Amino acid sequence: MAKKSSSRLPKRKGEYTYRGKTVSELQELSLEEFAELLPSRERRSLKRGFTDGQKKVLHEFKEGKKIRTHHRDMIILPEMIGKTIEIHNGKGFVSVDLQPEMVGHRFGEFAPTRSRVSHGSAGVGATRSSKFVPLK
C-alpha cells in the first residue's frame, strides 16, 4: 500500500499553537481576526471594545513600560506574550510572566485573590481535653 502524502506539516515538539496557529501567526493577526479564534465569551468582550482603563494598559504595553494594573478582566492578547505584568489581587500586586499558553485568558486568572489558610495548633485551654495537659 502506498502512503498518503498529507499537506500538513508535522508539528514540532514543544511548539505551542492556539487553535492551530503558532505564536508568530497569532501576533500577525488583527484584533478582529484574533477575536474569531476565541471562545464566545471572550470574543463578545473584545467585540464590545476596550474600556478607557484597558486602552491605557494596551498603550503602556506598546511603549514597553512596566505595568501594574487593577484590570483583572482584561483578555491576554498575542502581542502581550513575553512581557511581565503586575496584577492586583486585592491586597498587593502579583508579578506574572505572560506565556503563550495564557493567550485568551483573563489577567485575574493568574493572580488568585484567596490564599489557603493553615491554622496552627490549638493553645492550652482551647478545648476541654487540653485542660489536663501539664504546663511544663
UniProtKB/Swiss-Prot annotation:
Lineage of the organism: Archaea, Methanobacteriati, Methanobacteriota, Stenosarchaea group, Methanomicrobia
InterPro entries per record: Ribosomal_uS19, Ribosomal_uS19_CS, Ribosomal_uS19_euk/arc, Ribosomal_uS19_SF
Keyword vocabulary terms for this entry: Ribonucleoprotein, Ribosomal protein, RNA-binding, rRNA-binding
HAMAP family membership: Ribosomal_uS19 (MF_00531)
Annotated Pfam families: Ribosomal_S19
Membership in a protein family: Belongs to the universal ribosomal protein uS19 family.
Gene3D superfamilies: 30s Ribosomal Protein S19, Chain A (3.30.860.10)
Keyword Manganese in record: no
Keyword Repressor included in the entry's annotation: no
The protein's name in its UniProt record: Small ribosomal subunit protein uS19
GO molecular-function terms, A-Z: rRNA binding; structural constituent of ribosome
A biological process from GO: translation
Database matches in PANTHER family: RIBOSOMAL PROTEIN S19P FAMILY MEMBER (PTHR11880), SMALL RIBOSOMAL SUBUNIT PROTEIN US19 (PTHR11880:SF2)
Region (Disordered): 114-136
Organism of derivation: Methanosarcina acetivorans (strain ATCC 35395 / DSM 2834 / JCM 12185 / C2A)
Reported function: Protein S19 forms a complex with S13 that binds strongly to the 16S ribosomal RNA.
GO cellular component assignments: cytosolic small ribosomal subunit
